[in-house]
Amino acid sequence: MVDMKANPFYLSDDDCKWVEDTIAGMTLDEKIGQLFFNMGSSREEEYLKMTVEKYHIGGIRYNPATADEVYEQNRILQENSKIPLIIACNTENGGD
């Protein structure tokens, strides 16, 4: 068992309970989906909702866009994902 209260996690008792309850409530498809990141090939709301609902992705890497476009994309994804997503970016060119 992983000690989630120790380095590098430092989770509280409530945080540990959330993690344990969340994992216990996940289907096998949801657990597998958490291993994958989507490359954000579209910012259309219907596509974004389908991606999190069908594939249960663990995160997304956004493509170059305005701050407002990236914000809206992430808002839609987070609001429709059962589990908070990790958001990644391409920062070697300043985050695009």
Q: Model segments located where?
A:
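N-terminal beta-rich core of secreted/periplasmic extracellular enzymes
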Residues: 1-96
